[in-house]
Each structure stands twice: as structure tokens, then as C-alpha cells.
A protein has these predicted regions:
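Mixed-charge, polar/low-complexity N-terminal
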Residues: 6-8, 13-15, 19-21, 48, ...
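Catalytic core of the metallo-beta-lactamase
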Residues: 24-114, 121-129, 137
Length: 187
């Protein structure tokens, strides 16, 4: 992201509470960004990390069209609530409860026909049930994503997303560091 911003002059946008050592816009929940005739709305969806943010794309008519859900919502799963919190004063259960609230108040209130673009698909340690698909819609996720069940209590959700979590991959602290500090450009 640092190299892309440098090459294009585009701003880097992070969610609320993010701390970086490079120039970035720290978006507020609900903050809107205009790009031509479309609008991007930052929806603060903490739980995977405290700065996790979902970006809602509104078309030229102001209609909600898609979400870029990062690691908050995957196709088939949600982001595990422990990877970026080493040393924080929060437990996995605390973060899972925050993630539950984010899903219920920010994402599950959106239209079923909304396109969902997660950060990535299967092959990551970020969740146990990530789909190989890289694009879907919110309605499909309501039917197929265990974490989106409307009858699931907060306590059930916390247990479901925290049971059986393996230790974070050894490389993950480096990922967190690069997100905050940038990286050496090798181009």
C-alpha cells in the first residue's frame, strides 16, 4: 500500500484507532469518501482487530452496492479475533464479542443483494472455513456462513469463533509491523 500510494498519489485510509508511522487518513466511523460519482463509507467493524473497517461502496445513485469487508467477514467465515492483539488488554473472547456486535449492527443490517469482497479467500490462517471463492453476496452468506446465523447468541458466537484456535502463524507479528510501519520497497 505504501508503494502504491507513492506511485499514484492516492491516500492510504485506515480505520479508527489505527496507528501508523507513515502518512495515512485515519477514517472515522461513517466517514464518506467521494471518488468521482461513487461514495465509499467507512464502517468501523472491530473484532478481528480494533481498527478493522468495512468499506461500503455506494453507486452514483446513492444505492448500497458492495462491501469491502477486509478480514471482518469472509465468504464462509469471519476473521479470527486474536491475531493482532498480542499484548493488548483484551482476550479472544472480548474481541469475539466485539466482532459479534460489529456483524450484527453494521453488516447484517445491510441489503442481502450487496456484493461482498473479502480481503482474501481460503489458504489463510485467518479463519477455519474460508471459501475458495473471492466474491459473493450478503444473502448467500446469511445462508452459508455459520457465524451469520441470526439465531446464534453472543455467547454461542464467542464459543464458536474461539474454540480450537491454533496459535497465530509465526510470521504474523511481522505482518502487523508492516501494516503499521510500512515496508522496504523492493521494486
Amino acid at each position: 500500500h505504501v508503494s502504491l500510494a507513492k506511485e499514484t498519489g492516492a491516500a492510504i485510509v485506515f480505520g479508527p484507532t489505527a496507528q501508523t508511522s507513515f502518512k495515512a487518513i485515519i477514517a472515522e466511523d461513517g466517514q464518506e469518501f467521494k471518488i468521482g460519482v461513487i461514495t465509499i463509507v467507512a464502517l468501523h467493524t472491530p473484532g478481528h482487530t480494533m481498527e478493522s473497517t468495512t468499506y461500503l461502496l455506494r453507486d452514483e445513485n446513492g444505492k448500497d452496492y458492495a462491501i469491502f469487508s477486509g478480514d471482518t467477514l469472509f465468504l464462509g467465515d469471519v476473521g479470527r479475533p486474536d491475531l493482532a492483539q498480542k499484548g493488548a488488554d483484551m482476550t479472544q473472547a472480548d474481541l469475539a464479542g466485539i466482532l459479534f456486535n460489529s456483524l450484527r449492527t453494521k453488516i447484517m443490517t445491510l441489503s442481502d443483494d450487496l456484493i461482498v469482497y473479502p480481503a482474501h479467500g481460503a489458504g489463510s490462517a485467518c479463519g477455519n472455513n474460508l471459501s475458495k471463492e473471492t466474491v459473493g453476496n450478503r444473502g448467500e452468506q446469511k445462508q452459508t456462513n455459520y457465524a451469520r446465523r441470526t439465531d446464534m447468541t453472543k455467547e454461542e458466537f464467542i464459543k464458536e469463533v474461539t474454540d480450537g484456535l491454533l496459535p497465530p502463524p509465526q510470521y504474523f507479528p511481522l505482518n502487523v509491523k508492516m501494516n503499521k510501519e510500512g515496508y522496504d520497497d523492493i521494486s
